[in-house]
Amino acid sequence: MEKRKSIFFANDSEDNTSSGDLSSFTKRGTITPGKIANAREGELSQMIDVESEQKYQEIIELLVTGGYFRARISGLSPFDKVVGGMAWSITASNVDVDADLFFQENSNIKQKVSLSEELIKALNRMKCPFPLQAQHITLLNYITLFPIIRWLITKVIETREETGDLLRMYSISMFSKDYIAPIDEDMKKSLNESCDFIESVEKRYKPTRKFKRANNTKSTPTQTLLEYGKLHRISRLPTNINENKEAAQKLESQLSGKDGSGKDTTEAEREEEEKRIKQMMKGMKGVEGDALSKVSGGVLKSFLPSEEITNLSERYGDMSDLGGAEGAKMMAEKLHRQKITNLEKLIQQKNQELEQIINAHSERQTELEQLQLLVGKKQAFNERIIRETEKLDALETPENTKALQALRSLVLLNETLIAQEELFKQSCKRQMVEYKQKIEQLLSQDASTQEDLQDSDRQQQIQQAFDSDIGKLKKLKLLLNKKNRDISLIQRYLDELPSRAELLQYQRQFVELSEQSSSKLTETRQYYTTYNTFEDKKTLLENELSILNSIQSKYSIAMSSTNNKELFIKSMDQIIDGIQQVLDKSENKWNVEKVRHDTLSDQYMTLLDQERNYYKLTKDFEEECRKNELLIKKLNELQ
């Protein structure tokens, strides 16, 4: 079996044990074959692998929770599960994806890239808030894909709820077209009955016009009520209206405290109101007569019954005479209502003031309680200090008398120092105020004192020092900019160097490309072999056809005589011998190829066994290494 060349390493011999790492690929001086380049990078890649595995499990759980149960199939690859789940989520969110995922598994890298681009286009149409690139999908970057799949599952659930509501409404509407629920039927009957009742009430009690106003008369609310026969109800006042009037006058006199002025104002208002009402009644009487002259008796009977017409004529005939007294009664009642409203407003205002006073009292009460609590705490503290001093005095003995005296002297010294510190602070503050005043006085002096030669020399020195410092600052800024440029160049160079995770991705990508190229090479060889086989078959069929044509053309001539027949038979024997030789060669070649195929199959099975054994031994070795690390850790803890 021809060994495939590696695209990663220069030395591809079987005894080279460093083909698993990327030392010769990276060309770094600190990395040597057979050793790990950097322990921190190894730990980082291991942490990334653990986190990626955890995110992969969470993605599968999210897809199953969302309803994509195909992710439970253990025979599918992670790419098919994750990308299939993403496509299913996008389709379930009512967004189309131009890809066929359900009948094509284990795609090559070109199909994966095209599929990833279609998914990214669909996510952009959905306005996904998370950035995504095609390499994240093809290389299965689970850490980047996890928030996107979580967002897609939430979209699926929202779309499912919306479609569920729409389907529920549609089913209810379709049911309502052919059937009616018992509750709806009872409600419809009661609604129809109530509507009929309301219509009958509206028809019975609707307002009807009973009189007509003159055209040259100005429209007022009172005249409009009179047209519809509503004003006559105002005349039906209770018999005790005088009593109410007297009570209102008494209440007004008690509130105002001015009997004479209140009465005069009320009498004047009453007289004015009586005059206005009399004038309006006279106009309405003329309008009534005019209306009676224009409206016929039959039309009026159609509006009102005969008894109602008689009563109205009697009432409105006497209204001109009784209009002043009734108007005064109405005015008194109106004034009474106004006084009541004013009293209610005054009561409401006083209540608000009372609430404000109560709130202020409660605030003062809380402040008083806080002060009482503070005083109680101070008193308790003083009592505790007194008790402690009494205890200390009781504990005083001839042995510790000197120590207590020394302690008392130290306490007194501390208190005196504190008092001196306060006095010193106060004196410093006073001096600071005095110095500030002096400085202000000096600054407010004449400008001639500022033009002294010494001050000018000092200003020149300060200016020179300032200029020199500015020059130094510029030089330092130039050096800093140069250092920043160097740092940025080094940083850019370091950024261009691939990390171990990127190198692992590159290696995986190169391996996939190598596998794809080898599969294409195998496929091309199969095409060539098939073509050669068909070409040989075509040649044999052409030879057979030519032989059959020659036999057919010479058969009649050969059968004409015995000599020709013998020659014909000999030529046929030669042809058969040639065909037999070709057949023998083909059989020998087929046998050789079969033996080679069997040998290669045996070698392949042997290699598969070795691979299984290698993976098993590697796993056992890792387990033993882990146990060894645990034992070393425990040993270190015991030491």
UniProtKB/Swiss-Prot annotation:
InterPro entries linked: CCDC93, CCDC93_CC, CCDC93_N
Keyword Transit peptide (UniProt): no
Residue stretches of biased makeup (Basic and acidic residues): 260-275
Example of a GO biological process term: Golgi to plasma membrane transport
Coiled coil: 332-492
Pfam families (alphabetical): CCDC93_CC (PF09762), CCDC93_N (PF21673)
Region (Disordered) location: 250-275
Keyword Nucleus assigned: no
Keywords, in A-Z order: Coiled coil
PANTHER family, sorted: COILED-COIL DOMAIN-CONTAINING PROTEIN 93 (PTHR16441:SF0), FIDIPIDINE (PTHR16441)
Family assignment from sequence similarity: Belongs to the CCDC93 family.
Protein name: Coiled-coil domain-containing protein 93 homolog
Species in which this protein is naturally found: Dictyostelium discoideum (Social amoeba)
Top-level taxonomy: Eukaryota, Amoebozoa, Evosea, Eumycetozoa, Dictyostelia
